[in-house]
Amino acid sequence: MFLNEITIVITTFFSEEKLIKCLKSINGKCKVIVIENSKNNELKKNLNENHKNVECIVLNENSGFAKSNNIGLKMVKTKYALILNPDTILEKDALHNF
């Protein structure tokens, strides 16, 4: 599978430390959409500065896991989408085996 055909959607709520580890395991290999439920604009700033493959949407309220994932999925423009939790660490070739 070509990594440019996958967008990863991650819903978070004050999970920056875990999210950064997750993003490192993705290693900039495909597009990522982060939906942050905590009004944490600092997270968005950090991601914009340090992770060029990541788009962060900060919601005005905690919309919950399902609704937030649906918001992220509506933004996906690739053939495939993969929903991850922020504490997920991908194995080295996990995306190649998707």
Where are these regions (language model features)?
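Acidic helix N-cap motif at the loop->helix transition within catalytic regions
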Residues: K18-I20, N40-E49
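A conserved acidic beta->alpha catalytic loop
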Residues: S25, E36-K45, E61
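Catalytic metal- and UDP-sugar-binding loop of GT-A-like glycosyltransferases, i.e.
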Residues: L59, L84-P86
